């Protein structure tokens, strides 16, 4: 006889009634949420998560990024904390409108304007024990949060993360996206290449953390305007905690849209990675110098390309 079952979803829980423990649905839930602890004849409450998004001048992508979080369909309590830095566009207005439309969204001020301050402020006001870092310039892949929670539970890691999947919309952004995935562009980190197997890593893109582990090492260093993820992951590993990479975690990242914006981003990232190397000498890696090398290459390539266009126009 066929098994009759009902799947009741609400914002806070999944209730599974009459399900065979060997059924595909039950096996899927066991894999995603605390394997071995779910009785499929009763209700299950997925671990609650706090999503923290630093935001500054992101009117172009903010709504899309938040929608990507809300559309995850995560079967547990979730809050989204938008830490808004002083912006020159409609970012603050868009953020407030999003909060009015969905009570899971909270808006806090980040008067200092830096990313580490935004992240620390978000963690400080968060209600839950799992912190999901999201970039307003990015879009989470399907089941990203559920998969990350399962990885935290299964591996015992302090931080889990995956692939930065750069995708551009304009021809320039598309060219930059290709450079991002090149070993000559941003080094051969697993989260740029996506060809590494799951396992321990030096660092990962963004990250899903245990709040207790973040607090134990002092959170994000507020002095690192850039490269704060590299520096934090170094301290997590030095404390005996584990950073875990999985290619099953994928985030679409939108590159900067102009040469000027891209060069500024890479130049500042290169400066701060040098500071990581200065403070933590045993973290030195060729990957840290990939960003300034990439800036030089992109700038030189752009200049040569413009020279070629001019010569072609003149017929020389």
Language-model features, listed with the residues they occupy:
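Cell-envelope/extracellular polymer assembly enzymes that use nucleotide-activated donors
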Residues: 47-50, 79, 231
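Short, acidic, metal-binding catalytic loop of nucleotide-sugar glycosyltransferases
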Residues: 67-77
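A conserved acidic beta->alpha catalytic loop
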Residues: 84-93, 112, 135-138
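Glycine-rich, basic loop-to-helix element that forms the pyrophosphate-binding segment
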Residues: 110-126, 147, 200, 204
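Short aromatic/hydrophobic "clamp" motif used to bind/position activated sugar donors
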Residues: 131
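Conserved donor NDP-sugar-binding/catalytic core segment of glycosyltransferases
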Residues: 143-174, 178, 250, 254
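Short, flexible, basic/aromatic active-site loop/helix in glycosyltransferases
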Residues: 162-168, 177-206, 215, 274, ...
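Catalytic donor/gating beta->alpha subdomain of glycosyltransferases that bind UDP-sugars
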Residues: 221-284
């Amino acid at each position: 006889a066929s098994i009759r079952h009902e799947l009741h979803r609400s914002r806070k829980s999944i209730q599974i009634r009459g399900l065979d423990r060997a059924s595909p649905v039950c096996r899927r839930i066991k894999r995603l949420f605390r394997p071995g602890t779910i009785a499929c004849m009763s209700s299950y409450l997925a671990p609650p998560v706090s999503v923290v998004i630093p935001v500054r001048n992101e009117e172009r992508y903010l709504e899309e990024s938040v929608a990507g979080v809300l559309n995850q369909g995560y079967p547990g309590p979730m809050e989204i904390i938008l830490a808004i830095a002083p912006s020159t566009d409609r970012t603050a207005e868009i953020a407030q409108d999003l909060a009015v439309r969905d009570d899971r969204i909270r808006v806090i001020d980040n008067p200092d304007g830096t990313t580490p301050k935004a992240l620390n402020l978000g963690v400080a006001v968060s209600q839950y024990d799992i912190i999901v870092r999201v970039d307003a310039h990015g879009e989470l892949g399907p089941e990203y949060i559920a998969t990350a929670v399962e990885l935290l539970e299964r591996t015992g890691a302090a931080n889990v993360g995956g692939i930065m999947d750069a995708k551009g919309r304009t021809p320039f952004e598309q060219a930059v996206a290709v450079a991002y995935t090149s070993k000559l562009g941003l080094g051969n980190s697993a989260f740029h290449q996506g060809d590494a197997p799951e396992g321990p890593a030096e660092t990962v893109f963004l990250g899903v953390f245990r709040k207790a582990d973040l607090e134990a090492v002092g959170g994000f260093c507020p002095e690192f305007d850039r490269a704060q993820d590299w520096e934090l992951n170094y301290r997590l590993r030095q404390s005996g905690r584990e950073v875990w990479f999985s290619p099953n975690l994928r985030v679409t990242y939108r590159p900067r849209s102009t040469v000027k914006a891209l060069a500024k981003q890479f130049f500042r990232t290169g400066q701060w990675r040098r500071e990581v190397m200065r403070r933590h000498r045993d973290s030195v890696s060729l990957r840290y110098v990939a960003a300034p090398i990439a800036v030089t290459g992109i700038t030189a390539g752009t200049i040569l390309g413009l020279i070629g266009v001019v010569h072609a126009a003149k017929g020389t």
